[in-house]
């Protein structure tokens, strides 16, 4: 199933915005199901994810295999929330039959053996593998293509 998100936020009920994916798309747990409700902090807290050991970092969370929803925020943000207030939670998302985009290249070599390089671009805002992996794979392919000509 493909997942698409249009809008997602947590704000004080009829008041100040607290968490918004317009500020950082890591704020929403990947594959969150649609939600539009008002909650107290006790119920909301079960859906908030932080990294207490890294209080300024927003964690990356996803729920591919279980329908759920949640928000990710810095631990410092969590500590600043007024826990006595009510919260409006909105996740405007949808699931649908999608398609798989991919790229491939096959380079013949001297041997009949095959070597497969695989990479992905499925995690948002994570440059450590989401852009570095495809870039490195392209560089290796270019190098092997040039080397094979000589």
Residue locations for each model-derived region?
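N-terminal hydrophobic/helix-forming segments and targeting peptides
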Residues: 1-150
């Amino acid at each position: 199933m493909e997942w698409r998100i249009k809008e997602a936020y947590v704000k004080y009920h009829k008041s100040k915005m607290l968490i918004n994916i317009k500020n950082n798309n890591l704020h929403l747990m990947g594959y969150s199901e649609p939600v539009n409700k008002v909650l107290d902090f006790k119920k909301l807290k079960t859906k908030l994810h932080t990294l207490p050991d890294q209080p300024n970092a927003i964690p990356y969370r996803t729920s591919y295999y279980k329908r759920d929803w949640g928000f990710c925020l810095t631990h410092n943000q969590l500590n600043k929330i007024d826990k006595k207030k009510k919260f409006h939670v909105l996740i405007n998302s949808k699931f649908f039959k999608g398609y798989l985009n991919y790229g491939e290249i096959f380079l013949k070599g001297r041997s009949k053996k095959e070597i497969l390089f695989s990479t992905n671009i499925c995690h948002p805002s994570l440059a450590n593998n989401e852009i570095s992996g495809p870039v490195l794979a392209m560089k290796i392919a270019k190098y092997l293509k040039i080397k094979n000509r000589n």
